Amino acid sequence: MKKVLITGGSGLLGQYINLIAPKRLSIVTTFRNNPGNCKEFPSSKIDILNANQLENIIQNVKPAVVIHTAAVTNPIPKKNQPPKEYFNTNVTATKNIAELCAQYNSKLVYVSTDLVYAGYRGSFLKEDAKLIPATLYAETKLIGEQKVKEFTDNYLIIRTALLYGIGLNHSRCHFQDMLNNLRNKRPVKLFVDQFRTPISLTDASEIIVNLASTDHKGEILNLGGVERISRSDLGEILCSLGGFDKNLLQKITMDDIPNFPKVEDVSLNIEKLQALGFKPRTIQENISEILATNSRI
């Protein structure tokens, strides 16, 4: 089997990739602080901001593929969080990884975001749609994409849509908090005016691993679900399938949140992905599975 090195292995998406990748690939996964499920696999604690540590692990592992998920992902910086944290991780470390992948002949699978697109150019955006990131997070992810293309030819850039599911160990996501609140009969505020094409953590990680195991390269791919919906719509589906009280859903607009970056529609066209044979499941199918396998959060 091909050997793969995973960055951000203790993150929300990384832990799912850890679970799925061994079916197809020989993995070494990495973490910086909390290991999450990395301890269950061949793993190493590294700081991707340390160029020497990065080179040492790539030199020692000699991966055929590097799946780069590590990132600073907060859409809005936390209080007193300096912008340089975004640039150091999302740009500089990504550039270093791309250079090392070129040096050691490793394919780089770079996980980016749907938020690099302009949020006012229509629905079901193709990969060549206009790019106007509205947040520091999205801006640095886009610069990261540019660094990948600048320093290596053997790459795949995967722009992921909103991820939903149940975070493993210490990781969490908005969907998980929504489910927990509804189960405990607590109200949930949800946007009615932001549209995306959500994809489950399970489907996203399966597709990323499958793409990593192929020789496909030199391309940008949208990775999302087939349905364009708002977070409010997602909450409605969850209530219907889980038997929760829809009156707990409090519909709000982005204008209701001071200083919130207004990204109205970054729903993704996934025809290129589908042409490669990938077919994400519907939201109803995924949520039904989540409810069946996670009776308690």
Regions found by a protein language model. Give the residues of each.
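Conserved C-terminal active-site "lid" loop/helix of NAD(P)H-dependent oxidoreductases
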Residues: S230-E236, I252-I297
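NAD(P)H-binding glycine-rich loop region in Rossmannoid oxidoreductase-like domains
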Residues: I48-T89, L100
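Rossmann-fold cofactor-recognition segment
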Residues: C38-N50
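Catalytic helix-loop patch of NAD(P)-dependent Rossmann-fold dehydrogenases
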Residues: K84, N88, T92-N96, V116-I158, ...
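Mid/C-terminal beta-alpha module of Rossmann-like enzyme folds, strongest
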Residues: I207, T214-P258
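SDR active-site strand-loop-helix element
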Residues: T7, T30, V66-A70, L108-D114, ...
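N-terminal Rossmann NAD(P)H-binding glycine-rich loop of SDR-like oxidoreductase domains
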Residues: K2-R24
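NAD(P)-dependent short-chain dehydrogenase/reductase
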Residues: Q146-R196, N210
